[in-house]
Amino acid sequence: MNLVGSYAHHHHHHHSHPPHPMLHEPFLFGPASRCHQERPYFQSWLLSPADAAPDFPAGGPPPTTAVAAAAYGPDARPSQSPGRLEALGSRLPKRKGSGPKKERRRTESINSAFAELRECIPNVPADTKLSKIKTLRLATSYIAYLMDVLAKDAQAGDPEAFKAELKKTDGGRESKRKRELPQQPESFPPASGPGEKRIKGRTGWPQQVWALELNQ
C-alpha cells in the first residue's frame, strides 16, 4: 500500500517526469518471469508433436504410403509378381517339348516304312536283321529284276529265283546275277507258250532268262 500511495503522491507533484520504472516492476516483470518459467512447459506441449514427427514434404504421402512405395518401387506391378513369373517359366519347357515329339513321330514313320519294304523283298530269312542301307539296296536290286522281266516279256517263274544278296560285294549287276544262278535248273517249271496262262504270284527268274544272261 505504501507503493501505491507513493506512486500517487509522486505522480501528483511531478507531472513532467515519467514514472519511475521501479514502480511498475511488480506488474511488468512479475508476469514475464512467470511466463518465462512456464514457457518450457508450453513449448514442450505445443512443439513436441511436431518435433517427434519425421519431416515429410508438404503434400506428400502419409508414412504408410511412403514405406510401401519404397518397398515395392515405382515400377512394381501386379503382373511382375513372383508367382506370375514362375507360371510363365513353367510354360517354356512345354513349348520345347513339342520338338522331340515331332521328331519321334517322324522316326517311327520312317521305321514303319522300312519294315513294310523289307516284307516286299522275297527270300530274306526271317531271323535276318537288315539295316536301312541293305534294305534299300535289296529293294533296288529286286526292282531292277522285275523291270528286266517286264522288258523281256518273260513268263512269271518261281520267286525263289531271286535271292537276297546279304553280303557286301564290289561287283556290278551282272556279277550278282551270275552268283544268283540256281544250282538245280530242273526245279524251275518249263517255259510256257505264248497262249498259255501265266502263273500268278511274285515273278521269278526263269531258266531261259538265266541262259540268255550267261550266253551274253
UniProtKB/Swiss-Prot annotation:
- The segment annotated Disordered runs over 1-20, 53-109, 165-203
A single Gene Ontology biological process assigned to it is:
heart development
**Residues of the signal peptide:** none
Basic residues composition-biased segments = 8-18, 92-104
Please provide the record's keywords in A-Z order. Activator, Developmental protein, DNA-binding, Nucleus, Phosphoprotein, Transcription, Transcription regulation
Cellular location of this protein? Nucleus, Nucleoplasm; Nucleus, Nucleolus
Q: In which tissues is it expressed?
A: Smooth muscle cells of the gut and adrenal tissue.
Q: Which residues are reported to carry the modification Phosphothreonine? A: 107
**Could you state what the record's PTM comment says about this protein?**
Phosphorylation by PLK4 disrupts the interaction with MDFIC and leads to translocation into the nucleoplasm, allowing dimerization and transcription factor activity.
bHLH domain span:
94-146
Composition bias of kind Basic and acidic residues appears in 165-174
Sequence positions bearing Phosphoserine: 109
Kindly report the protein's main subcellular placement as a broad class: nucleus
Q: Which Pfam families match?
A: HLH
Molecular function as annotated in GO: bHLH transcription factor binding; DNA binding; DNA-binding transcription activator activity, RNA polymerase II-specific; DNA-binding transcription repressor activity, RNA polymerase II-specific; enzyme binding; identical protein binding; protein homodimerization activity; RNA polymerase II cis-regulatory region sequence-specific DNA binding
Q: Where is the composition biased (Low complexity)?
A: 65-78
Role of this protein: Transcription factor that plays an essential role in both trophoblast giant cell differentiation and in cardiac morphogenesis. Binds the DNA sequence 5'-NRTCTG-3' (non-canonical E-box). Acts as a transcriptional repressor of SOX15. In the adult, could be required for ongoing expression of cardiac-specific genes.
Know the name of this protein?
Heart- and neural crest derivatives-expressed protein 1
